[in-house]
C-alpha cells in the first residue's frame, strides 16, 4: 500500500465526522479553523517586523491580526459557554511559548469535535486564558493594550466590513477594509 492509499483508508470520512454534529459543532469547527488561520497571519505579521524598530505606525497589521485572533478565541469560548471565565481578569502571566498555548487549545477542540473525546471545559478555559495572555503580551509589544486590540477589531468589523452588525457571506468576501484578500 502506498502512502496516498493509506491516507485514503485512514482519514475519517466527512459523513462520519458530521453524523452526530449539530449547528453548534459546525460553529466550533469554524472558530477552530479561524484560530489556526489568524495565528498564522499573526506569525506572518511578526516575521515582517523582524529586524525593524517597532512603533505604533508599523505594527497596525499585527494589531489587526491579533484582534482577528481574539474574535475567534472569544467565539470559541462562547460556543463552550466559558466566555466569562476566559475573560476574567487578571489574566495569567504570559508564557514564553505562545505556540504551546495555541496547540493545547486547538488540540483539545479538534479531539472533541473530530474524535468525540470528552472535553473538560475548565481545562479549555485555562488554555484559552493562557493564549489570551500571550495575545495581550504581543499587544503590549506594539504599544497597545488588549482592550485597544479589541477596540481596533470592533472598529474594523462594524465600521467597515459588517456595517449593519450582522454576518453575511457577501460581506465576508467583499472586504472593503483590506487591500489584499487573504
Short names for language-model regions:
Residues 1-182:
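Flexible "arm" and connector segments at domain edges
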Amino acid at each position: 500500500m502506498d502512502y496516498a492509499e493509506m491516507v485514503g483508508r485512514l482519514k475519517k470520512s466527512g459523513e462520519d465526522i458530521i453524523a452526530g454534529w449539530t449547528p453548534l459543532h459546525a460553529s466550533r469547527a469554524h472558530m477552530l479553523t479561524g484560530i489556526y488561520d489568524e495565528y498564522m497571519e499573526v506569525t506572518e505579521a511578526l516575521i515582517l517586523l523582524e529586524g525593524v524598530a517597532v512603533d505604533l505606525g508599523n505594527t497596525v497589521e499585527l494589531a489587526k491580526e491579533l484582534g482577528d485572533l481574539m474574535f475567534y478565541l472569544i467565539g470559541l469560548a462562547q460556543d463552550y459557554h466559558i466566555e466569562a471565565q476566559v475573560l476574567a481578569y487578571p489574566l495569567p502571566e504570559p508564557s514564553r511559548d505562545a505556540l504551546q498555548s495555541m496547540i493545547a487549545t486547538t488540540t483539545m477542540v479538534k479531539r472533541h469535535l473530530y474524535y468525540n473525546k470528552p472535553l473538560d471545559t475548565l481545562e479549555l478555559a485555562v488554555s484559552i486564558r493562557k493564549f489570551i495572555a500571550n495575545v495581550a503580551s504581543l499587544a503590549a509589544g506594539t504599544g497597545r493594550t488588549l482592550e485597544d486590540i479589541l477596540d481596533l477589531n470592533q472598529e474594523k468589523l462594524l465600521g467597515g466590513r459588517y456595517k449593519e452588525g450582522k454576518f453575511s457571506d457577501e460581506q465576508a468576501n467583499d472586504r472593503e477594509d483590506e487591500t489584499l484578500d487573504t
